């Protein structure tokens, strides 16, 4: 395993990229109409409180909580806790537990431990630019799902005590599942690619979200850490 594989995994937590079985109940037209309404509401709200879980096969699981804004670029701060997996102990040693990920319009910044900083010239924060091809915000994911050829309604389910309608469709190499409440608000989103799964629960739409930019002298680029630069 590469020396910094656990660092790569931890830094990926903030990307916010399982699913359950089901077959199409209704046509794509009805599904797309509901998803368009949900996307309009997400865009209008501009922010929300989030509770996200990430699973990377058997290697690592984590939970991230906080608030994110997408009204003018992505901004917000998440507290990240490692919850299990084969790399849990070593990830905690390098990344700290809890750690923190800050989202700013240009990139996400992940706080690492003093042990990590000793290996990186005293720098604690990893700066990772966004993949512009990815689904960075809930509105992006809903847009991708609206455009999916196989988008469909799976059925009705309960999400943390709220009755919701479940929709699913393919996106790139994986698929997206979303759950909308009775008012067509997004309450849960799951994205699955290979053995990488992220599930995000949303509440408190319109909640304040902010992030402070780490000092440049305390920041190292992701490409430098992984040797990709």
Regions found by a protein language model. Give the residues of each.
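Short, hydrophobic/aromatic-rich segments at coil-to-beta transitions
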Residues: 44-51, 73-77, 88, 160-168, ...
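Beta-turn initiation residues at beta-strand->coil junctions
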Residues: 52-56, 79-83, 111-114, 190-194, ...
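Amphipathic hydrophobic-ligand
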Residues: 59-65, 93-96, 195
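An acidic-aromatic
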Residues: 70-136, 197-199
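Solvent-exposed helix/loop surface patches that form functional interfaces
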Residues: 120-159, 215-217, 228
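Gly/Pro-enriched, hydrophobic low-complexity segments
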Residues: 162-218
